[in-house]
Amino acid sequence: TFLTVIAAHAANKTLYAGKLKFDPVTSFAPVSLVGIAPIMILVSNDLPVKTVGELIAYAKQNPGKISFGSSGVGAAAHLTSELIMQVTGTRMVHVPYKGTAPALADLMSGNIQMLLDVPIGTMSQVKAGKVRALAMMSKERVPGAEDIPTIVESGGPLIESSSWVMFMAPAGTPKEIVDRIGDEVAKAM
């Protein structure tokens, strides 16, 4: 039996300390990284900002007035939003959702003002003009989304953040099996 995990898996040990019946780190062995994508900063069309620099300035002038959604407590987007607030000295309100779809719907309707997520689930709404992408949280522009600036180009601090998907095996799975499955996944990708 193998498990597919996302980046939030890495935070579970800390977020749910003492509440889990297993150790998210030591109970599994990594098999293969399947994919990785940078986090994108999205805002509602109603928010009067066009860059990350303007977003930071607006958040400082309006502490607690910007609400940001995430696909759930402990998700990469949630933790990255908290890091942005810590680094920039801003205060925003976290609204956790059960997945990206309801958060994106609320962003489009203006119920929340900001959402961080990977491009695959949100780019169609950006291209349709239903939300604005301020930046990718990467050092370089992202292939296929070259028109979206990096966070630094958009006036923000250099904070890189991404989400990933990984195959994991139960701890104690023989190394030969883990290596072979990892090699086969790499060939398939």
Question: Can you name each region flagged by the protein language model?
Answer:
Residues Q113, I120-G121, K139, P157:
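Flexible glycine-rich beta->alpha loop in the catalytic core of nucleotide-sugar glycosyltransferases
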Residues T1, A10-P102, I151, W164-M189:
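Hinge/capping helix and adjacent helix->loop/strand transition within the periplasmic-binding protein
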